[in-house]
């Protein structure tokens, strides 16, 4: 449990770990979505060309890749900080905020890339979208993460 009067410190440390672990599951889903969208964009044809050749589709996939790689590095940084016994509160909050909101955007992009079929239950994107919205709520809402970051900036 820890020493008396140090509960907030223990809670803060455990929340950083919790956020990092939860975000890893978001990251895994983002990666799977990216891979499925790339495969689909290479094989689905419209007007005689793979849809990945159209800028609108390619740009969405590029944005998904950028969000995924940024999220991955942010999660690794939080894990490294905690492993080194360094304060990770603000980094964990920034990571939670960025990854959860990026997860929602990637889900919306995946649905858009797949068109009408992206919203059907058979492809799982609609379920992943519902799950992604939850990631902005649990373990501290996006607004709470912004408050933690602002406090870390001494605002």
What are these language model-derived features?
Residues 4-8, 12-155:
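Alpha-helical interface subdomain recognition
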